[in-house]
Swiss-Prot record:
EC number: 5.3.1.1
UniProt cross-references to Pfam families, sorted A to Z: TIM (PF00121)
Keywords from the named record: Cytoplasm, Gluconeogenesis, Glycolysis, Isomerase
CDD domains named in the record: TIM
Taxonomic source organism: Enterobacter sp. (strain 638)
GO biological process: gluconeogenesis; glyceraldehyde-3-phosphate biosynthetic process; glycerol catabolic process; glycolytic process
UniProt-annotated binding residues for substrate: N9, W10, K11, G173, S212, G233, G234
Name of protein: Triosephosphate isomerase
Catalytic residue list: H95 (electrophile), E167 (proton acceptor)
Reactions performed catalytically: D-glyceraldehyde 3-phosphate = dihydroxyacetone phosphate
GO cellular component: cytosol
UniProt similarity note: Belongs to the triosephosphate isomerase family.
Length: 255
């Protein structure tokens, strides 16, 4: 049975005060939660502070991006070795904001995936279609292409112990969200697509939903059989809202 994971992507938000206050509040809100793994991805500059603030809790550290290089003359980048050294575990790659604003290709994201696996870190591979692609009926085609960038170069075994986050681009930060049935259909397609290469691997892959997940829609999303948690944006910056989402995932998967 898959163990749900709810991860907060803080994006470009934070301060020393905010990190300490938010994590302190999360610790209170999430006390006693054992049926759902919880991770947070603050900006890199606050990773060490967040690590100490979360020390002794069940909150696991993550990061929002990684470079393909481990060291060298690559100004402004953060390597997988550095993230591992500081204690990060779940590393987001392929987020639509990186694909759009930084022109990251499927091939580059696949390289990041490989580097993370080599370092023993867990990739959180974001995939998803734009509004235009959705309206053109290309959702499955786009998701398959983004998965195949890894599948065809690294094999199905590369997805062992990995997290995939399906984030329809049209739902990120817009207030729109896929209906539970829509999200489930895509999640099932993703799992079935990997299963064509290896059914056993596909069954254990955690597939999160992302895209305007909030306290109001989380519970219904998590009742779907192939939705294994969420990658949460704005709601992860509020301890009470984030805790509702985590508890909804725990309750749904224990039902």
């Amino acid at each position: 049975m898959r163990h749900p994971l709810v991860m907060g992507n803080w994006k470009l938000n934070g301060s020393r005060h905010m990190v300490n206050e938010l994590i302190a509040n999360l610790r209170k809100e999430l006390a006693g939660v054992t049926g759902c793994a919880v991770a947070i991805a603050p900006p890199d500059i606050y990773l060490d502070l967040a690590k100490h603030a979360a020390d002794g809790s069940h909150i696991v550290l993550g990061a929002q991006n990684v470079d393909v290089n481990l060291s060298g003359a690559f100004t402004g980048e953060t390597s997988a070795e550095m993230l591992k050294d500081i204690g990060a575990k779940y590393i987001i790659i392929g987020h639509s904001e990186r694909r759009t604003y930084h022109k990251e290709s499927d091939e580059l994201i696949a390289k990041k995936f490989a580097v993370l696996k080599e370092q023993g870190l867990i990739p959180v591979l974001c995939i998803g279609e734009t509004e235009a692609e959705n309206e053109a009926g290309k959702t499955e085609e786009v998701c398959a292409r983004q998965i195949d960038a890894v599948l065809k170069t690294q094999g199905a075994s590369a997805f062992e112990g990995v997290v995939i986050a399906y984030e329809p681009v049209w739902a990120i930060g817009t207030g729109k969200s896929a209906t539970p049935a829509q999200a489930q259909a895509v999640h099932k397609f993703i799992r079935d697509h990997i299963a064509k290469a290896d059914a056993k691997v596909a069954e254990q892959v955690i597939i999160q939903y992302g895209g305007s997940v909030n306290a109001a829609n989380a519970a219904e999303l998590f009742t779907q059989p192939d939705i294994d948690g969420a990658l949460v944006g704005g709601a992860s910056l509020k301890a009470d809202a984030f805790a509702v989402i985590v508890k909804a995932a725990e309750a749904a998967k224990q039902a």
